[in-house]
From Swiss-Prot:
Lineage of the species this protein comes from: Bacteria, Bacillati, Bacillota, Bacilli, Bacillales
Lineage: superkingdom: Bacteria
Name of protein: Uncharacterized lipoprotein SAS2259
Lipid-modified residues, N-palmitoyl cysteine kind: 18
Lipidation (S-diacylglycerol cysteine): 18
Amino acid sequence: MKRLVTGLLALSLFLAACGQDSDQQKDGNKEKDDKAKTEQQDKKTNDSSKDKKDNKDDSKDVNKDNKDNSANDNQQQSNSNATNNDQNQTNNNQANNNQKSSYVAPYYGQNAAPVARQIYPFNGNKTQALQQLPNFQTALNAANNEANKFGSNNKVYNDYSIEEHNGNYKYVFSFKDPNANGKYSIVTVDYTGQAMVTDPNYQQ
C-alpha cells in the first residue's frame, strides 16, 4: 500500500513537471511569434519610411530637373531674343546705309541752260521741299522716260527747279532735244512720284 501511494505521488509530480514544461514551451513559442511579428512590423515600417524617403528624393530630383529645364528654356529664349535684336539692328543699319548710298543731291546737266529755273523760279525753303519730294534721281529718271514719249526718245537732261502750290511741291525738269535746236521738253514730278509732260516743245 505504501509503495502504491509512493508510486502515485511520483507519477503526479512527473505529470506536473511535464505540464509545466509544456506551458513554458508554449510561452516561449508565443514570445518567439510575438518577437517575429514585431520584427516584421518594424521591417514594414522601415520599408515604408524608406519608400517615402525615396519618393521624396525622387520628387526633389524631378523638381530639380524641372527647374533646370525651365532655366534652360529661359536662357534659350533670351539667346533667341538677343539674336533677333542683333538681326533687326543689322537690317536697320543696312537699310540706312542703302538709303544713304542711294541718295543723290539735286544737280544740273552739263552746260545747262536756265530753262526750268527761268519758267519756275523757286525762292522757298529748298530743304523743306526736298523732304516732301521723292528721291531726286528716281524723279529725274521718271521724268526722262516721260519726256522721251514725245518726239525724239534720246532727250538729254538740262536743269530743274521746284514749283510750290498750297504747300505742295513738284520737281520741274527740262530736257533738251538734240534733234531740235533750242527746244526742250518740260516735265513735272509731284510728291507722289507721278511724272507729267507739261510742254513737249518749249522753245528757249
